Regions:
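Serine/threonine-rich, low-complexity intrinsically disordered segments
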Residues: 6, 20-21
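Bacterial N-terminal signal peptides that target proteins for export
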Residues: 1-8
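N-terminal signal peptide c-region/cleavage motif recognized by signal peptidases
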Residues: 14-19
Length: 339
């Protein structure tokens, strides 16, 4: 009887401790519009959440809400600011006008790899260039994609003149300007809807890195892939500032230890590897054609698109921002990585 009573007390005590630990765990909702099985959601965000959870020793429980369940692509910034989500992974270019200097990475032919773009973005943030546009949120980290190539449904493109009249997806403001200067008709379609838009003929093609092909099943609706390194995009893992400030110092440190260059460099390594993997897979698919634009054709693109940089610098100047300094610093960092 005595042993039974002691066993009961120990069991109740253990259950109480477990319940207390669960009660003390702080849940953080991490939102993304990417499908649950897409590369970013499953290999970057879920892995980051697992790492933070493990390092917090149960103090944090980051849960990923994928597929836009907490808000669609253009709403990711708003749901973090409004507290619907605690953290969000978002395309900064989707949020009109909020992140002007961060759009430097979108300029034509600036980057080739995620490693270079991500290093440049986090360096710009560390050195204070992006302080104004990041005010009001806790920035966990930034990264870019590898350079965007053209992925087409039925029309093979190579020269700048080949785009005239084609319906092309516009992933950002600068990409829209690029496509307009090439004579294409820009169509705004959220990334998850690209495959369906191509299938229905709403789009003839889209600029995307190879990483997006598997995530959005583009291999089923495209067959021509032309490499030009035309543009890029800036992505941010952002957190509600009040939520971050409410955390105990030890849990803030866990977030901080997985932020900035640590996050950006780690994510970029995975992204560049996935880009190479998906390109190899596409190359092995029957009926798919990959073409690399030769240097003389690239020079034609550069000649047509050259005014975009000057226009961007003028736009930054009009906003009272030092675009010249940001572009110069971005180029320095990118050159140190991409060569």
């Amino acid at each position: 009887m005595k042993k039974t009573l002691i066993g009961f007390i120990v069991g109740v005590w253990s259950l109480s401790i477990t319940t207390l630990a669960i009660a003390d765990s702080i849940e953080l909702k991490l939102a993304t519009f990417e499908p649950p099985k897409a590369f970013i959601a499953s290999q970057i965000l879920a892995a980051w959440a697992d790492k933070v959870n493990a390092e917090s020793n149960g103090g944090l429980e980051v849960k990923v809400f994928a597929g836009g369940t907490l808000g669609g692509p253009p709403k990711q910034y708003d749901i973090v600011k409004g507290g619907v989500a605690d953290i969000s992974w978002t395309v900064l270019g989707y949020i009109g006008g909020q992140f002007p200097l961060s759009s430097v990475i979108e300029l034509p032919f600036l980057t080739r790899t995620s490693a270079a773009g991500s290093k440049a973005l986090n360096t710009l943030y560390d050195e204070g260039y992006l302080d104004k546009e990041m005010a009001g949120i806790k920035l966990i980290g930034l990264h870019s994609n590898p350079a965007y190539q053209f992925h087409m449904k039925d029309t093979q493109v190579m020269n700048p003149g080949d785009f005239k009249g084609l319906k092309m997806r516009v992933p950002s403001k600068i990409a829209g300007t690029i496509l307009a200067k090439l004579g294409a008709t820009g169509v705004k379609v959220p990334a998850p809807g690209t495959s369906e838009a191509l299938r229905k003929g709403v789009l003839d093609g889209t600029p995307f890195p190879y990483t997006a092909i598997g995530s959005f099943k583009l291999q089923d609706v495209t067959k021509y892939h032309t490499e030009v390194n035309i543009t890029n995009a800036t992505f941010g893992l952002i957190m509600n500032e009040d939520k971050y400030n409410s955390l105990p110092d030890d849990l803030k440190k866990v977030i901080d230890n997985n932020s900035g260059h640590v996050f950006g460099d780690w994510a970029a390594g995975l992204i560049d590897a996935q880009n190479a993997k998906m390109k190899a897979e596409v190359a092995g698919l029957e009926g798919h054609v990959i073409t690399v634009a030769p240097d003389d054709v690239i020079e034609e693109y550069k000649s047509i698109l050259a005014p975009i940089e000057a226009e961007w610098l003028e736009e930054m100047k009009g906003k009272g921002l030092d675009g010249d300094a940001v572009l110069k610093r971005a180029r320095e960092v990118i050159s140190s990585v991409d060569g």
